[in-house]
From Swiss-Prot:
The gene is NP. This is Nucleoprotein. Residues 8-22 have a biased composition (Basic and acidic residues). Belongs to the influenza viruses nucleoprotein family. The keyword Amino-acid biosynthesis does not apply. The keyword Oxidoreductase does not apply. Late in virus-infected cells, may be cleaved from a 56-kDa protein to a 53-kDa protein by a cellular caspase. This cleavage might be a marker for the onset of apoptosis in infected cells or have a specific function in virus host interaction. Homomultimerizes to form the nucleocapsid. May bind host exportin-1/XPO1. Binds to viral genomic RNA. Protein-RNA contacts are mediated by a combination of electrostatic interactions between positively charged residues and the phosphate backbone and planar interactions between aromatic side chains and bases. SUPFAM superfamilies: flu NP-like. A motif (Unconventional nuclear localization signal) lies at residues 1-18. One of its GO terms (biological process) is symbiont entry into host cell.
Amino acid sequence: MASQGTKRSYEQMETGGERQDATEIRASVGRMIGGIGRFYIQMCTELKLSDYEGRLIQNSITIERMVLSAFDERRNKYLEEHPSVGKDPKKTGGPIYRRIDGKWMRELILYDKEEIRRVWRQANNGEDATAGLTHIMIWHSNLNDATYQRTRALVRTGMDPRMCSLMQGSTLPRRSGAAGAAVKGVGTMNMELIRMIKRGINDRNFWRGENGRRTRIAYERMCNILKGKFQTAAQKAMMDQVRESRNPGNAEIEDLIFLARSALILRGSVAHKSCLPACVYGLAVASGHDFEREGYSLVGIDPFKLLQNSQVFSLIRPNENPAHKSQLVWMACHSAAFEDLRVSGFIRGKKVIPRGKLSTRGVQIASNENVETMDSSTLELRSRYWAIRTRSGGNTNQQKASAGQISVQPTFSVQRNLPFERATVMAAFIGNNEGRTSDMRTEIIRMMESAKPEDLSFQGRGVFELSDEKATNPIVPSFDMNNEGSYFFGDNAEEYDN
């Protein structure tokens, strides 16, 4: 692990800032959050949304998607060059839900992208404020992570669907920058690389010419990002080997799949940030909260405090359970889709149940669903304790684990042993003799085999009372180690479809 001295903190990545001290970081993250809030308030005014409608998470998501679309330069350019029937490249929109005569109604709105860019810049002191856009992307990514399984995508790239704990950020757009790269899981980076190598195998010109040179630079950069997530020398050395390959092919794909499996036990470091829906920031700004003056951190108590007193609503389909919908959104808000359920449940102060047992579908409503039969209910997003978000995968040891997901990726810096069954993971290595046998592989397998069940595999700080803002009195929760900790265990969650 590179020493902290050479790494920019997340908040610096998030705000594109150079080295800053803690106060400056808190202020610049606060400025970013305040900008999102001001933008949201202005959009609600332009759309004439009532206070209640402005607190509806589905409306928040539509407004967020509109601003992301307005700033998606590559797509905008593509749309202008390839006009498709019935799609105006200069406009963006989506469903807005309004409460009319005691019923919810859907209204499809269309806006000039230019107009939305104007509102966004105005809310952000005239700047493009890309950090705020990335923040919104990460919130959408965290929501997808909590809602969908990526089984199909995993299988397509030759990985095991049980490796879903490595897939954080798999739906983040490419343009999400350093802050986006920080939150991507090992499996996500892996998959991007495998897709790239496969294209190279199928398309002779992929690595050639001027374009090929750019492709190569992107390939090496992605390799370096993935290498930076691994915590052991042998895993890093294997990544060097993949990066330096003259002509990446099947051997590299095998190495990458091997590394992804190894990450189930020798976990990578992946950042976690609490990114909340724009309407939450809007509510706070509207009530007079000055984020820039107060400062804000995505990895501390601030998001917990914000959620303690924000009332957000959601549309609920006739057979959905509002409490389950709340759990889904709570997990998304704290980037906790791959966290151990026992830890999440302790912090939330309510039992957190696996995805397969939730009676709820995604938050977004498809255009063919009938909204008039839907009710709205308050999302319960409060917590009993708070904990610092971690960027470390923790040191590892062995535990009984499930068929559905054979590892977790810790979100909260809380001490516990991590559930995984060594036999299950090691079985994934049997009979795979393709790729190169090398000292590195042997070394990695040796480390995995010697991972001990007794060790506390994740040394964290513990959780804190919400009154303990300075994190002075850690409470170390005790967990029933026989209980299952995986969210996607034995699951039938929907697949994510673009």
